[in-house]
Amino acid sequence: RMVLLKGHDERGFVFYTNFESRKAGDVLGNPNVALLFHWKSLRRQVRIEGPASRVTNAEGDAYFASRMRESQLGAWASDQSRPLDSRETFETRYQAMVERFEGKDVPRPPHWSGFRVVPERIEFWQDRAHRLHERRLFTRSGEGWSEGLLYP
């Protein structure tokens, strides 16, 4: 799945989504995930593996409040990934949310929040000639990290 990384700190990497989406269902069904950052033009990538868990309600609320109002309203109007009979139906639902929250702050919907991926393995890959790539792996070990190389 493609996601937008919205934060990272010593606790992990955070992205936000509709928890009724297929993507969220997949993560909730199997929280062992991988994030992949690929930069073709730089001939490098980073892969992060670890368990994903929901962010706190306070974190979800704070990030939702930072979004543009139109995006907040869209989160309320959308049944993400479900069949839609017409664009007009969605636009009508969106307009209903505009009216519902007119003059008020838009709260975070109960079905919308974020996941934090806690890294257990981080692999740095660099393209090399003749597929003799360089792969460096960091593995969480207690409170620290161990480092090693992998064959290409």
Predicted regions span which residues?
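Binding-site signature for planar aromatic cofactors or substrates
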Residues: R1-P152
